[in-house]
Amino acid sequence: MGFITKAIPIVLAALSTVNGARILEAGPHAETIPNKYIVVMKKDVSEESFSAHTTWLSQTLNSRLMRRAGSSKPMAGMQNKYSLGGIFRAYSGEFDDAMIKDISSHDDVDFIEPDFVVRATTNGTNLTHQDNVPSWGLARVSTRKPGGTTYYYDPSAGKGVTAYVIDTGIDTKHEDFGGRAKWGKNLVDQMDEDCNGHGTHVAGTVGGTKYGLAKGVSLVAVKVLDCEGSGSNSGVIKGMEWAMMDASGGGNGTAKAAGKAVMNMSLGGPRSEATNQAAKAISDAGIFLAVAAGNENMDAQHSSPASEPSVCTVAASTKDDGKANFSNFGSVVDVYAPGKDIVSLKPGGGTDTLSGTSMASPHVCGLGAYLIGLGKQGGPGLCDTIKQMATDAIQSPGEDTTSKLIYNGSGK
């Protein structure tokens, strides 16, 4: 397991343009969901105009259902509506070809793209320390050279910061979380549990007491992937919207302020303009977002959200500072982090050892929380801080790819 995705080198291509609206298609290897689409509005569309558009949509769908009653199985219509920071407005649902044609001719629509399957991405002077660390990644991020067995960190340890784990859920009762993990939102099923294990492993690296980088951080589970580690692109965007709202105080207000929040997305799929715009809206709201680069050993520009420039895209390194053979690479990668044979938590207690850029990304998310706890500025600029602090360590990082490996600035 690891980066749960089957992202392949796919670039969305415009099929047609009708009155300015683009109808996009995913490449031949994307696992599209029949008749499911994401409709994204133009950036200058107001909330009032968006509401008027969705009213028109409902009325048009109802009118068509009445005309063809009994002739065929009706489409579900709009199922999700999104509004992220007044920047990204969109909706998703089930529509037939005729309805998509009508939607594409609407002046307020920017583009339409098919919904598809997304998967998790698995295959100081006042320092304290943790000796004989259970996972090599902890020692590696706090020392300038490989081979260490001690994790050096400031005792602030990310206290006062909230980390949103957008994944398969978290076993919030696992003893290593020490009561700091809670459920936020479940957008997949009725089971507030991690029946896959991926999300718990990721959360353990972010903020477990023994296995995490930010040992004092608060953790929030946002479940967008099922027991098989898969979900829909539209569902992932809905989870992103909820997390952003909560981090900004619009939901339960767990984080109190966006600048005290970090997010991790160890998941991905083919490049999606809708996903990238949603990720940018999160960054624009002042929230630090770490994402997995992907596990296909290809250029990460073909995967989302990894290809979004405003997020912190993370490739996976090995114990001897090499590029993990599965890790994606390319100019969109911001940093490397440990991602091979990472020990972290599993649901029900105990641990598991997993590899993937899914395991690398939470090292960066945890480091982000740790640095905010030390007083560093949060938001997308935090990725620049992390890059500046990183060591030039990765051997043969890949074509047009950084050799920077994350470092927490311990001085060791």
Curated annotation (Swiss-Prot):
Glycans are attached at N252, N264, N325, N408. GO terms for molecular function: serine-type endopeptidase activity. The lineage of its organism: Eukaryota, Fungi, Dikarya, Ascomycota, Pezizomycotina. Secreted subtilisin-like serine protease with keratinolytic activity that contributes to pathogenicity. It holds the Pfam family Peptidase_S8. This is Subtilisin-like protease 6. It is an enzyme of class 3 (hydrolase). Its main location: secreted. One of its GO terms (cellular component) is extracellular region.
